[in-house]
Design a protein with these regions (language model features):
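Glycine/charged-rich beta-loop-alpha catalytic/anionic-binding loops adjacent to active sites
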Residues: 6-8, 12, 129-132
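Long amphipathic all-alpha helical oligomerization modules
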Residues: 153-171
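Amphipathic alpha-helical interface segments
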Residues: 73, 77-146, 150, 162
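A structural-propensity feature for long, helix-poor, extended segments
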Residues: 43-85
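Disorder-to-helix initiation segments
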Residues: 9-20, 44-55, 59-62, 94-101, ...
C-alpha cells in the first residue's frame, strides 16, 4: 500500500484516477472477502463454513479480475499518450495519428467501463457479509461496499471524460 501511495504522490500522470478507481474496487472486494473468511472461522458457525468459503472465493475472484485492470488502465492511458505523440506533418500522418488516437481512446473508455461493472458486481460480497456475516465485522463489510462504490463512481468519471474524446458518439 505504501508503494501505491508514494507513486500517486509523484509527478507522473499514471497511474491516475482510473487505476485508483480499480484499486478501490479491489480493496472493497478484499474487505468483503476478509469478512467471509472471518465468518467461516467464527466459533459456533462450523456448519456455515462452506457458505462463507463460497463468498470468500467470489470475493477473491473479483479481487484478481480488478487487480488485472489496474495495469490495463495505466496501459490504456499510455496508449493515448503514445498516439498523441505520433507525427502529424503530412495528411497521411494526420490520418494515421487520428485513427490511433480514436482506437486508444476507445480502449481507454472500455477499461473503466469494465471497472464499473466489476466494482458494482463485487458489492454483492460486501452486501451479503453485512447481512449474514460475523456481526463484529459489519463495519468492514460496509467500508468494503463504500470502497467498491467509490470504484464505480471513479470509473464512471473516467468513462465520461474518455468517451468525450471519441468521434463516434454512438459508441
Amino acid at each position: 500500500a505504501s508503494d501505491v501511495y508514494k507513486r500517486q504522490a509523484s509527478e507522473s500522470p499514471a497511474p491516475g484516477g482510473g487505476s485508483i478507481s480499480v484499486y478501490m474496487g479491489a480493496l472493497g472486494a478484499a474487505l468483503g472477502t476478509m469478512v467471509a473468511n472471518l465468518s467461516s472461522h467464527k466459533r459456533g458457525w462450523d456448519e456455515r463454513w462452506e457458505e462463507f468459503s463460497d463468498w470468500a472465493e467470489k470475493g477473491k475472484a473479483f479481487q484478481i479480475q480488478l487487480m488485472k485492470l489496474v495495469d490495463e488502465d495505466t496501459d490504456s492511458f499510455n496508449k493515448i499518450m503514445d498516439a498523441f505523440s505520433l507525427p502529424k506533418k503530412t495528411e497521411e500522418e494526420k490520418a494515421i495519428r487520428k485513427q490511433a488516437v480514436q482506437e486508444a481512446t476507445r480502449f481507454a473508455t472500455e477499461v473503466p467501463f469494465k471497472t464499473m461493472q466489476l466494482c458494482y458486481e463485487c458489492m454483492s460480497v460486501a452486501k451479503a457479509m453485512a447481512e449474514i456475516g460475523n456481526p463484529n465485522s459489519v463495519t468492514d463489510a460496509g467500508v468494503g461496499a463504500l470502497a467498491a462504490r467509490a470504484g464505480v463512481v471513479g470509473a464512471f468519471l473516467n468513462v465520461k471524460i474518455n468517451a468525450s474524446g471519441l468521434d463516434d458518439k454512438a459508441y
